[in-house]
Amino acid sequence: MTFTLGMVGAGQFASHFAVLFDKHPGISTLYATDVIPERAQQLVDELDLAGTFPSFEDMLASPDVDAVAIFTQRWTHGPLVLQALQAGKHVYSAVPMATAQTEIESIIQAVQETGLTYMMGETSQYNPATVFARKKAEQGAFGRVFYAEGDYVHDMDLGFYDAYKYSGGDDWKATASYPPMWYPTHAIGGVLGAVPRHATSVSCIGVHDDRGDGVFDTAVSMFDNDYSNMTALFELDGGGSMRINEFRRVGFPSYIRESRFRWFGTDGSFEQLVTNSVWQDRDGVTDVSDQIANRPTMDEDDPRLADVSPALRSSFVSGHAPVHDDLTGRLPAEFDFAPNGHEGSHQLLVDDFVTAVNDGVLPPVNAWQAARYTLPGLIAFESAKRDGARLTIPDQGDAPVAVGERLPAADRVS
């Protein structure tokens, strides 16, 4: 069983996923479209894909396309996802899910009404630390988790200026001010991807940027944002708390590790720094760094990374870690020696989506889970603008079926 897929966006990030979608035997045909047509054509030529569409709308109108994978600028995801679902297409979306609560609610409603597959490609779902902690949580080794931390620590000087210039064109500074808490899913998704909880309230503090270079400047920002660093404390359902840091001006080697996590339970805990990770309980400390160390899939000077800033290339070469070994057996043989990325997550995410569409089952990072990874950050940003006021976070509830189970009947493409 196979389906056809259209790549929406053909930039740096999209091209690396296109390779995997093209290799997966569950996808029969791959197309591309981009607002810069030359990029779509280049992707088609490099991978010998089926062809391009002149626009997103043309792609949605085509009966030759069953599903779309959205890799556009982050503030455009919500409306594009909703448009695709309403056109009858399954959707894979890069993070975040959306930038407004109403968009999130509308996406969930559309998934319920259509029975189509929606999946957000949150890489932290397969971050080695999250995989390790998820296994410990399933074993009951943490006891009751009462506190956790997730940090997405990525300095603007380490590749983000180049990335925003590539995607934003002449007006890149207006978009480079994207609010840090509107990009919360790597940090929140890493924490909640290990423990089945959700945030219920938040108090957030933002640090006003003082670089003075036109980035994070309300006079320029299309988001009216001048926070470059933000810290939020979330209350979790059932008790306990979660601290999330989103830092964009920070002396930290994000090219070594840009996301790091900690979980504390009544029986055990896990802590992570840049180059080491430890499991701790009352009996002592165990260094588990080797279990979550990624194996590279290509060199950072590989020609396929020519358009990627050197400071960002580590995210596109990292393969699986030993802790992934019991997950990779499901991957198709076509992925052997294929590129991976973001700490070994790319191949697993692609396979999750292909399996969900072809089998009609709920993927791990489904619409309801994506909402729990995304909406808390949107509410946190509002809290920061209100001097840290504690705000309630609406929850969209649990998915109607468990992960891996068949979705309710609808006019599915299969």
Regions found by a protein language model. Name each.
Residues 62, 66-67, 73-74, 78-126, ...:
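Beta-strand-loop-alpha-helix segment that lines the small-molecule cofactor/substrate pocket
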Residues 28-29, 334-338, 355-373:
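Glycine- and charged-residue-rich phosphate/anionic-cofactor binding loop of Rossmann-like
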Residues 88, 115, 140, 239, ...:
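Glycine-centered short loops/turns at secondary-structure junctions
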Residues 182-307, 339, 346-363, 377-381, ...:
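Contiguous beta-strand/loop segments that form the cofactor/metal-binding neighborhood of enzyme cores
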Residues 1-47:
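N-terminal Rossmann-like dinucleotide-binding module
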Residues 124-225:
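Predominantly a Rossmann-like dinucleotide-binding segment in NAD(P)-dependent oxidoreductases
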Residues 116, 143-147, 173, 383-414:
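C-terminal capping/lid region of NAD(P)-dependent oxidoreductase domains
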Residues 49-56:
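Conserved SAM-binding strand-loop segment of SAM-dependent methyltransferases
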